Design a protein with these regions (language model features):
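Fe(II)/2-oxoglutarate oxygenase catalytic core
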Residues: 1-179, 183-209
C-alpha cells in the first residue's frame, strides 16, 4: 500500500499528570515478559525464551481501563484523518504498558499479520490497522531507546538502509504520541541508561479490500 504519511505525531499531547498516573497505576499491576505473536500464551522453554530475547527484550503490563482509552482515542481519529489514511477501524486492543530498562529493546517488526484474528471473540476476523505509541517518560530520563521507522516497504532497489530510516525524534518530549499504520516496520533500540516507559495500543478493523 502506498501512503504519503508513514506516521503522524502529537508532541507533548498528554499531560504530565496523565503520564505519571499511568506509570503509577501500571507499576501496581502484574508484570509479564514481552513476547512476539508466534509464541502465544503458553509456558516457554529456556531455549525459546533465549530465542525470543534475540528479537524482543522488555517487560510489560496489560491495561484495559476506560479512562486511558478516553484520553487516547481522539488522537487516533485525528491522525487517521489528517494523515489521509482514513482507515475504517472499530475497536482497540488492550493497552500495552512497556518498560525498557538497561539493554532492553525490540528489534525490527511490524504490528500486523498476514491473517485476521481467528480466535472467537470481539477481535475475530479483524486486523491491526493503526498503531499508537505514547511516550510516558521524557527523553532526558534515559539514553538509547530510540524509536526508528523503515519506510522502504522492502523495495529491492532501496538497498541503502540508512537512507530510508527515520528516527522519530518527535516522540522524545514526555506525553508525545505517534500514530502509524500497523504494517509499517519499526524498532526500539537498546536503552543504555535509565528506563523508558511507553504505552502502545493497536486499533482493529475488517481487512483491507
Amino acid at each position: 500500500m502506498n501512503i504519503s504519511n508513514y506516521y503522524w505525531h502529537f508532541p507533548g499531547a498528554l499531560t504530565p499528570k496523565f503520564c505519571d498516573d499511568v506509570i503509577a497505576y501500571a507499576n501496581q499491576q502484574e508484570e509479564v515478559m514481552a513476547r512476539t505473536g508466534g509464541y502465544g500464551d503458553r509456558k516457554l522453554k529456556k531455549e525459546e525464551i533465549k530465542d525470543l530475547k534475540r528479537k524482543r527484550n522488555s517487560d510489560l503490563v496489560w491495561l484495559n481501563d476506560t479512562w486511558i482509552y478516553k484520553e487516547l482515542h481522539p488522537y487516533v481519529h485525528e491522525a487517521n484523518a489528517r494523515a489521509g489514511w482514513n482507515f475504517d477501524w472499530e475497536r482497540s486492543e488492550s493497552c500495552q504498558f512497556t518498560k525498557y530498562k538497561h539493554n532492553q529493546y525490540y528489534d525490527w517488526h511490524c504490528d500486523s499479520w498476514d491473517k485476521p484474528y481467528e480466535k472467537e471473540g470481539p477481535d475475530f476476523g479483524k486486523i491491526r490497522k493503526l498503531s499508537m505509541t505514547c511516550q510516558l517518560t521524557d527523553g532526558s530520563e534515559y539514553t538509547g531507546g530510540e524509536l526508528e521507522f523503515d519506510f522502504r516497504n522492502y523495495d529491492p532497489h532501496m538497498r541503502d538502509e540508512a537512507k530510508h530510516l527515520r528516527r522519530a525524534k518527535e516522540i522524545l518530549p514526555k506525553g508525545s504520541i505517534i500514530v502509524f499504520p500497523s504494517f509499517v516496520w519499526h524498532r526500539v533500540k537498546p536503552v543504555t541508561s535509565g528506563t523508558r516507559y511507553s504505552l502502545v495500543v493497536w486499533h482493529l478493523g475488517k481487512p483491507f479490500k
